[in-house]
């Protein structure tokens, strides 16, 4: 009988943890990296204009106060997120852009409510599509910067996606 009681308690704890994950509201901010300095390098740094844009991101998105930062493993994506992460005293976690579902799963399981994710012209729109489970967004032109997707999750589903310039 005592064992049955412990099993019941354990089941309730697991069940309540699962419910919490799916009832949380989350805000996922998706940003393509800022302008890069040298398009001939495989891993270019940000240009002076890109560095200014990365600094502006802090002001534009300050009210969202991300609790977690994710970036692909490239200088330009990390350096786009860095001013904001530094201001919030957070580290930037690396994710594999070829595996968007792994990132989405980690976000959905996390207790964190607000995320900033930096990626590329051909990965950020795909991540927005994967989150919304719809093919709404096409890859950005290589010269297109300054677009922010704000994805709001409610009860485990996309509630809305806002697109903002910056």
Residue ranges and their predicted role:
Residues 1-25:
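Bacterial Sec-dependent N-terminal signal peptides
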Residues 24-111, 124-127, 134-148, 153-166:
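Active-site-proximal alpha-helix that buttresses catalytic centers in soluble enzyme cores
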Residues 114-115:
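Compact alpha-helical subdomains of small soluble proteins
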Residues 118-119:
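Short beta-strand segments
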